[in-house]
Design a protein with these regions (language model features):
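Exposed beta-strand and adjacent loop surfaces of beta-rich binding modules
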Residues: 30-32, 54, 65-67, 96, ...
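Bacterial N-terminal signal peptides
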Residues: 8-18
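Boundary of Sec targeting at the N-terminus
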Residues: 21-29
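Bacterial N-terminal signal peptides that target proteins for export
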Residues: 1-9
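N-terminal post-signal-peptidase region of extra-cytosolic proteins
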Residues: 37-45, 70-74, 82-86, 99-100
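Extracellular/periplasmic metallocenter environments
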Residues: 20-22, 79-120
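N-terminal, post-signal-peptide region of Sec/Tat-exported proteins
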Residues: 48-83
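N-terminal edge beta-strand
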Residues: 28-54
Length: 120
């Protein structure tokens, strides 16, 4: 009987440790940010993120194919016309990072930018 009690106690402790590690020590669920891309802008065109917090950017094109490249954060998306694409990443440095449309979308293509502010 004592042996069964010790085994149950040991298993309970292992389960508790596993549960604690997965909820406390693991990363938080990613924050989802929805963007809209249309000639020749992103909406919103500025986003503030926290360093070390995982993010999912979901970008929907309202018209033609677009892209989103943020070189410093290793984001490079191709968004089909009237479609959606997403990128998951965790910012590992602070600063202001400019993303640009990486798929030619018309005469205003060069001005299609978004700024991600990453703070502590």
């Amino acid at each position: 009987m004592k042996r069964k009690f010790m085994l149950a106690l040991l298993l309970g402790g292992l389960l508790l440790e596993t549960f604690s590690a997965s909820t406390v020590g693991g990363q938080a669920a990613p924050k989802t940010i929805n963007l809209t891309a249309h000639r020749f802008t992103y909406d919103p065109d500025e986003i503030t993120l926290k360093k070390g917090e995982p993010v999912v950017l979901v970008v929907k094109s309202q018209d033609v194919p677009h892209g989103l490249r943020i070189k410093e954060l290793n984001v490079d998306l191709k968004i089909p016309a009237h479609g959606t694409a997403q990128a998951q990443f965790t910012p590992d440095k602070t600063g202001d990072f400019v993303g640009q449309c990486s798929v030619f979308c018309g005469s205003g293509h060069g001005s299609m930018k978004i700024t991600l502010h990453v703070v502590e």
